[in-house]
Amino acid sequence: MTEPVPVPSLPPPPPGDRPPGIQVSGVHAAYGRIEVLHGVDLTVAAGSVFALLGPNGGGKSTLLKVIGGQLRPTRGSVTLGDQPVGRRSVERLARTGLCSIPEGRGVFPNLTVRENLRMWTYRGHLSMRTVEERTYAAFPRLSERRRQLAGSMSGGEQQMLAISRALVTDPSVLLLDELSMGLAPLIVGELYELVAGLSGQGMTILLVEQFVSAALAVADRAAILVHGRIEQEGEPRRMAEAALGAYLSG
């Protein structure tokens, strides 16, 4: 009897050949009478990292809120995979595989590290043991801080704790707002290594970032949002110089 010939596993297709993980179509959004987004179109391939760049006040965080269901667009639509965001609540979107980590990190400062993790087990339907194993394997230093109040930790450690939500709930779509804000470059590099690893496991990641070099190091594609409009989109290397010009003029 002959041995079966092993079939080599194929590498994942490039981002341009994958179905959309996030589809934004003609989105307008406003705060009261002030329109902030003006007909934004954006496609993020499933399992890829997409960096959204641009100066402050350009609408980046607003777009994340629309995608995450925190702000309803005045016109246009958003789809996550094959699920329209529509009028779904943030909680319902979380159950369909969305995890959003806002600017400011989104941890519970008056709870310990371990208590924060326990709060997130309810969403992921995982045992506390599994949650701790996943978190401490990714961030060993959090194991040493597990009885410490989250609000008393450094900014980098708080961001690590925030990102552990993505490890706990295993979402299909992850939104990251200003991951590197206020952090040392060494910590930023460590966090983005994890982001790249999550994408390699099939997670679709959209990140808003001002730390351009760190974001473009892990991104498959990038776009520049200025005054509520996508001005340019393309490969990360091409976007680096364009992003610098946008910051200087924005």
At which residue positions do the language-model features occur?
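The feature captures the beta-strand-to-loop junction immediately N-terminal to the Walker
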Residues: 53-55
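Helix-to-loop junction immediately C-terminal to a conserved catalytic motif
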Residues: 68
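Conserved ABC transporter NBD signature motif
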Residues: 76-84, 96, 128-130, 137, ...
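Conserved ABC ATPase signature
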Residues: 149-153, 157
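ABC ATPase C-loop
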Residues: 166-167
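Conserved catalytic motifs of ABC-family nucleotide-binding domains
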Residues: 170
